[in-house]
Amino acid sequence: HALARRARRCKYDRMIAFGKALPAIRERVEQDLALRGLPRDKVLATVVRLLETTLIRVGNLEYARRNRSFGLTTLRDRHVKVRGTQLSFAFRGKSGKDHHISIADRHLARIVKQCQDVPGYELFQYVDDAGQRHQISADDVNAYLREISGDEFSAKDFVPGPALF
């Protein structure tokens, strides 16, 4: 029981630290969402905003390939419909669970539509200065979160886990 208590305490302490870092994370995400065009940091900020607002898992290329299950970074253009300010996600997630999630956000809808307009079937990708397309990965999202938070936070910190107590 002592080990379980210690694990819960560590998780609780991490949640407190994440909560304290959240305002700075949100501020930087807001700045990056305002960038012109569709640079890497704008696409990463879009994924982080969606992590927070939808609680969709970040995703993993291996899961997508092996299990045909998706998360934010592995979504394809066909997994989201943009209608005005409405974003509607429909995809199979971890453990084969079907997800149907809708949010209304004019700014995110506009950015996601721009992402869909980039050639290729991956939703979250950007084109670099040399004209090369790059898909956003979970590693990219986690590195971005570490950079903007100044701490070792990851996409998993946005997704609620089992109860602490």
Q: Language-model features: where?
A:
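A positively charged, amphipathic N-terminal helix/segment that binds anionic biomolecules
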Residues: H1-F70, T74-F165
